[in-house]
Amino acid sequence: FADEPELRQERDRMLASGNPFGCGEDIETLDFDSYAPFPFLPPVTTGHFGAVYEIRTYKLKHGGVTPTIAAWEAAVPARVALSPLVIAMYALDGPARFTHIWPFASLDQRAAVRADSVAKGIWPPKGGPQWLTGEMYSTIALPTAISPLA
């Protein structure tokens, strides 16, 4: 969304509608999370970056958003030399957390890049893990044909 009022307007529209996406009969519940990109990152670029995407969310300790962003800002240039980053973003509502999305050619490439980044001391970002609560969720996703990341 271009700005917070536009985000709020769309959220209100979805909450008020019994059929917000043209498939209301198939929806039991909807959850909404609002995020802002880490401020040092460029805008998301669409295109084909991989066949597999990892979407990972970490819950943060109170006060952890700013130091996490700083740690990532220092570490991302070396990390993206190994594989691209779609986005890293922090939650605007709910518990303190951040989500990042990485594309990979395959699950094997994901494992190799992660191992390489740790072996080289590139990742995780120095000072970042101390702000994590230990609660993490990781999803492996395959883009559909209509995805802007397919």
Q: What do the PLM-derived regions correspond to, one by one?
A:
Residues 1-2, 59, 101-103:
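Short hydrophobic/aromatic beta-strand micro-patches
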Residues 3-16, 66-70, 106-119:
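Short amphipathic alpha-helices within nucleic acid-binding modules
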Residues 12-51, 82-99, 103-105, 115, ...:
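Glycine-rich beta-strand-turn "strand-cap" elements at beta-sheet edges
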Residues 42-43, 61-63, 108:
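A short, structured loop/turn motif at beta-sheet edges
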Residues 52-58:
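Short glycine-/aliphatic-rich beta-strand segments at the starts of folded cytosolic domains
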